[in-house]
Amino acid sequence: VYTGTFDPVTNGHLDIIERASKMYDVLYVTIFINPHKTCLFTVEERMEMLREATKQFPNVVIDESSSLAVEYAREVGAQVLVRGLRATEDYNYESLMCFTNQYLDDGIETVFLMTRLAYTFVSSSFVKEIVSHKHSVEGLVPACVEEKLIEKYRG
């Protein structure tokens, strides 16, 4: 299970998805619905962008959940949570999440994948900021996502 807000999905996310999809028979890429977070895109829009961006990976299942990651993993019968890391800041946060998940369910493992160097600076927030200032994010997000971002920001 690979969870995230994916608002929007970036090429950094896709790097992790592609690599994790080679490691497991099925990879659930799950949009975590956080009622305390304001998103640019609706859940439906994010699902649509993820489906389009991952259509080349036949073993990737796109889903949504408001459950905790370990609860969702239990629901779908998964034993591994995949997390992507860009830098030490990600590690600090993700290690705390890993320990929390171990506390909640010691039978579900967390696997950390370092993103490729080209994507170490890429985040959904960063991408939205760039587009809001009318700059291109080509190479940072799939083309279908860039189109949706431009529609949102430039009307």
Label the model's feature ranges:
Residues 1-155:
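Nucleotidyltransferase catalytic core that binds NTPs
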